[in-house]
Amino acid sequence: MTNVDIFYLVLGLALIAWAGRWAYRRHHYRSAMAQPFPDAWQQMLITRLPVYERLPAALKQELQAHIQHFLYTKQFVGCNGQDITDEVRVVIAAEACLLILNRASTRYKNLRWIYVYPSTFIAKREQQDAYGVVSESKTHMLGESWSNGRVILAWDSVERGMYNFSDGRNVVLHEFAHQLDQEDGAADGAPLLYTRDSYQIWAQVFSQEFTQLQAKLARGGNSLIDSYGATNPAEFFAVVTELFYERPAQMRKRHPELFKALQGYYRLDPEAWQKP
């Protein structure tokens, strides 16, 4: 047997092994997705995430399928002693998957890991001043989204958000909005849209609303949109996503064009889920 024969033999065996692993994973995935949504998870969502009960039946069923896919394809990691229980996994998955309901979605294809801390965590940042001097700063964080497939969350902040789904603040919605924004690269406040024309309309509406928020805050005024949204366009998108899902009636009334743009992107009307 020549070296060429050996090369092709090894290559063939490697391809057979790869195909076997792929077929096994596909079969295992299909089997997992065919399982009924566990009653324990359903009860968990009813008691821990009140908005779940108010979803229409079709959206509730779709959310369950997204949750199962999410939990099968993403890995949770506990940090600083945080236990990764079914409650932690299911609640985070449910809130994250609210953002991908009722529309064609990649299901966070770039996301691999969710790191969960018990409470606020410290993020270290290197910054360079005008003279080129590099220093390190430390910031207490509730959550963070990275473009390399990672989301970091503080569990106590997640809990506050899931029980109070009407204050316009939700760390899971915020960080996973960043994930959607990062699907086309760095977070810039413009996620992947459906048509080429959509980008022009999006840019017009968001630029105007972002500028108005900054101007209002500079004058010392109050805004329905949290002041953190004035940081940059990426944070603006994440902040108004929280508002869209949690305070849709107020947003529709005070920021109708912004609400319309977000409704066109998320293809939902969360006002239908609000308490009567």
Specify the residue positions occupied by each region the protein language model found:
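Active-site recognition of the HExxH zinc-binding catalytic motif
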Residues: P56, D167-E183, A238
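Short, charged/polar micro-motifs that form catalytic or ligand-binding hotspots
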Residues: L49, E53, G78, Q82, ...
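N-terminal low-structure segments adjacent to metalloprotease catalytic domains
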Residues: M1-S119, G185-I201, V205, P248, ...
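Metalloprotease/metallohydrolase-associated module, dominated by Zn2+-dependent proteases
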Residues: V91-Y108, W113, Y117-S166, A186-P276
